[in-house]
Design a protein with these regions (language model features):
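M16 family metallopeptidases and their MPP-like homologs
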Residues: 1-25, 45-55, 102, 107-272, ...
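Proteolytic maturation boundary segments
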Residues: 3-127, 264-334
């Protein structure tokens, strides 16, 4: 895309091939390519002369180019060298601040994942929520600009992302599970910062105002360009997902968010360009999910980290007195 931008001023020129191929067909009919070949090669004809020569004889004293043999190790490695290993500690399930807490005892870095259930959402609401996750990095909060908050997240957290995840479960009936996921990796001493910054990032980003509306237009335009480029590069994969969307809920949701259907949804928002209405819709969906949907918190860390998390959550934005119950995401297949 950058090449088209540099030479023509249009970043999407090379992504739309209809005009390009139409121009090439026109030149093909007019004999333009034949004339080009004539101009390039007719003035200086090329002649290739083959001179047969006998191959050189190998030097009898030279070392052979290849030595046949088999590598023999003094102590070949086997499965027994791995040992039995340490068995993984069993996870512990509990509840805190209206959320289900899963603790997986481990040492080293701490991994904190929050899963908001999306089983009660419609397809359109999931589409809006998916767009929201693409916007969060570009939005200010009452306390920080987007750049300041991103810098703080990079400083205190090894990684922190928000996204939509969905998969087909192994339970009876193979239900589709859909979640809004906030993932953070960090050092144990930064757990308090993770709760603070993760909450600000997910709950407090401003979805109204001039800056937010400018971010909506900017991010959606870039998303549209990215999807068009991916259609060209991986069109077969998008076609496969679109075909599977008629048979499995997981693929239907994938198609709605990041497939051709999702692309058309995104194009519709760009054509309407009603950013104030989009901000209100995103606020409504965020309110429904963050404050009412079932929340499961997964912690990979020490017992001390678990105790600290249980102390931090009740006073955080993640705490709710009552939440709904998790359920499978359903969608009528066409």
């Amino acid at each position: 895309a950058s090449t088209g931008w540099l030479h023509t001023g249009d970043p999407a020129l090379l992504l739309h091939t209809d005009k390009l191929f139409a121009a090439l067909r026109e030149k093909l009919d007019s004999g333009w390519f034949n004339e080009l070949l004539r101009e390039l090669f007719a003035p200086a004809p090329v002649q290739v002369i083959q001179v047969p020569t006998l191959p050189k004889k190998d030097d009898e004293n030279a070392a052979p180019a290849r030595t046949d043999g088999k590598l023999v190790l003094d102590h070949p490695l086997t499965v027994t060298d791995l040992g039995e290993g340490s068995p993984s500690a069993e996870g512990v399930v509990g509840t805190v601040a209206g959320a289900e807490l899963l603790h997986h005892p481990s040492k080293g870095s701490l991994y904190l994942n929050l899963y908001y259930d999306l089983g009660g959402l419609s397809e359109e609401e999931v589409q809006y929520l998916d767009i929201l996750t693409d916007m969060l990095d570009e939005l200010d909060t009452p306390r920080h600009t987007a750049r300041e908050l991103n810098t703080l997240r990079s400083t205190w957290l090894g990684d922190s992302t928000a996204c939509i995840a969905f998969w087909t479960g192994r339970q009876e009936g193979t239900p589709c599970h859909a979640k809004l996921v906030l993932s953070m990796s960090l050092l144990e001493r930064s757990l308090e910062k993770a709760i603070e910054l993760g909450g600000e990032f997910l709950y407090e980003t401003k979805l109204t105002g001039e800056k937010a509306e400018a971010a909506f237009a900017r991010v959606l335009s870039q998303q549209k360009l990215n999807m068009e480029q991916q259609f060209i590069q991986m069109g077969n994969q998008y076609a496969m997902v679109r075909a599977m969307s008629h048979y499995a809920v997981e693929y239907a949701l994938s198609e709605a968010c990041s497939g051709v259907t999702g692309y058309k949804f995104l194009c519709g928002l760009l054509e309407q360009a009603d950013w104030a209405a989009l901000g209100k819709k995103l606020e409504a969906v965020r309110e429904k999910v963050l404050h009412h949907a079932a929340l499961t918190i997964s912690l990979h860390g020490s017992e001390a980290a678990k105790q600290k998390l249980e102390a931090l959550l009740p006073g955080s934005v993640f705490a709710e007195e009552a939440r709904g119950t998790a359920k499978a995401y359903t969608q009528e297949l066409t």
